[in-house]
């Protein structure tokens, strides 16, 4: 398949995808990596979808990434004797550890770590932020609150505590079981929910090891304030705007998104923008103008990938949603200002040979009429560095490592082809010319920039650059 866009598409699978033919259509429409959402479905469902993806990957000879998204802790109130209550502004409400069904005056909060972390003056958000409570007093096993924003509260609605860091692991017992299953299955990426601090990444990394790559979901205010440390410890970042938009003021989300994208690009870490990008396409064959603009802005800001959630998992128009997202991406990338916007936000290179090579590639490709940049890389690290530079031409990543190729399905502008292990620079050059032409990325007379690392087989050793013409 010949790449026709640089920003990647991550699509969530669910009941809307009924078989291998649906998967193939989504890939041909522009999907590069699929998300298995472990908040829904069972292991049998996920195993079936995993196999469909791998079958399509083999049929199309096109590396596809698979990301498992762990559910993470779910903080909820308990139940009410009547199933629900109507809370009035200004009234008092106690939240406690007593499992007895609640009423107008109190309700169970089965999370002692929340009670321990809250102080008078802090706020709690209930039911995705629809209700807001302010803590007036804390006791050993309860907190007293005043209702600031009232409304109906029913059984087991969610709780958010944006002003506190909880003494809580991001991995529940369910997550650990799911993670073990996913790693055994062979997923390429693991998305970690409920990240509050860098230590959460270290905890997950200890369990994952080198079996998959780790994507941290930024959805907590404490993660935003420690973003750089978290990103340095992760392989990629997801801007999870759903919970993030509950825990911070909605008007802050666009600037936070922009800052996250800039930080990730400076660190050379792929960044995915997610949540409600084409939400109306769950039930409509066409998006709203605001949704189109949302996707376009993420592309313009330099995101590596954009994600579809319910649109492809359970919506009525999964294929149309992918097709629309691809159209928006291509329209933006072909616009007159896209490259200039990326150039303005280009990060400063580090004083390393590999970074110097990546910068040289970008400069040369802006001077010469280069058709494609070709990296031969066993780990994929040199192609990630090249992607950070956001060159004006596509990046062809040649690798003998299928896992590396799947990892790069989330990286901006990188198109991977798995080939035999090469041992000489001349062999790399001849193979690059052959594959670039076969992939439809170059034709006779085109100029190619080709990089490799000598000695071969050492990750991160890129130190050679050649300019070749396809004859």
What does each of the following model-derived ranges do?
Residues 1-471:
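Non-catalytic helical/linker scaffolds that mediate oligomerization, partner binding
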């Amino acid at each position: 398949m010949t790449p026709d866009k640089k920003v990647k598409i991550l699509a969530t699978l669910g009941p809307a995808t009924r078989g291998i033919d649906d998967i193939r259509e989504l890939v041909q429409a522009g999907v590069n990596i699929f998300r298995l959402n472990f908040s829904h479905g069972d292991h049998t469902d996920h195993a079936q979808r995993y196999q469909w993806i791998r079958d399509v990957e083999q049929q199309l000879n096109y590396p596809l990434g698979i990301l498992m998204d762990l559910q993470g802790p779910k903080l909820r109130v308990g139940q009410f004797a009547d199933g629900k209550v109507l809370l009035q502004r200004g009234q008092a409400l106690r939240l406690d550890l007593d499992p007895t069904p609640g009423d107008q005056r109190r309700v169970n909060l089965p999370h002692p770590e929340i009670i321990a972390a809250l102080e008078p003056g802090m706020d709690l958000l209930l039911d995705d932020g629809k209700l807001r409570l302010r803590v007036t007093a804390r006791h050993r096993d309860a907190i007293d609150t005043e209702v600031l924003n009232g409304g109906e509260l029913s059984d087991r609605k969610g709780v958010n505590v944006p002003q506190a860091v909880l003494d809580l692991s991001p991995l529940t017992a369910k997550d650990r079981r799911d993670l073990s299953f996913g790693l055994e299955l062979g997923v390429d990426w693991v998305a970690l929910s409920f990240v509050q601090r860098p230590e959460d990444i270290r905890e997950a990394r200890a369990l994952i090891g080198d079996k998959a790559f780790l994507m941290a979901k930024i959805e907590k205010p404490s993660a935003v304030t420690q973003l750089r440390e978290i990103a340095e410890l992760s392989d990629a970042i997801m801007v999870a705007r759903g919970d993030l938009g509950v825990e911070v003021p909605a008007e802050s989300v666009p600037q936070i998104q922009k800052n996250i994208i800039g930080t990730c690009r400076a660190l050379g870490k792929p960044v995915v923008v997610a949540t409600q990008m084409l939400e109306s396409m769950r039930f409509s064959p066409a998006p709203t103008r605001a949704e189109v603009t949302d996707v376009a802005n993420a592309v313009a800001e330099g995101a590596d990938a954009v994600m579809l959630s319910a649109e492809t998992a359970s919506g009525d128009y999964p294929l149309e949603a992918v097709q629309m997202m691809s159209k928006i991406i291509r329209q933006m990338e072909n616009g007159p200002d896209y490259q200039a916007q990326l150039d303005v936000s280009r990060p400063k290179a580090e004083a390393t040979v590999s970074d110097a090579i990546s910068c040289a590639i970008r400069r040369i490709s802006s001077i010469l009429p280069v058709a494609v940049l070709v990296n031969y890389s066993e780990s994929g690290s040199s192609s990630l560095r090249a992607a950070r530079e956001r060159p004006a031409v596509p990046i062809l990543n040649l690798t003998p490592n299928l896992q590396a190729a799947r990892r790069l399905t989330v990286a901006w502008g990188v198109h991977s082809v798995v080939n035999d292990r090469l041992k000489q620079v001349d062999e790399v050059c001849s193979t690059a010319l052959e594959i670039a032409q076969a992939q439809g990325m170059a034709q006779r007379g085109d100029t190619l920039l080709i990089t490799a690392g000598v000695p071969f087989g050492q990750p991160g050793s890129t130190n050679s650059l050649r300019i070749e013409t396809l004859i």
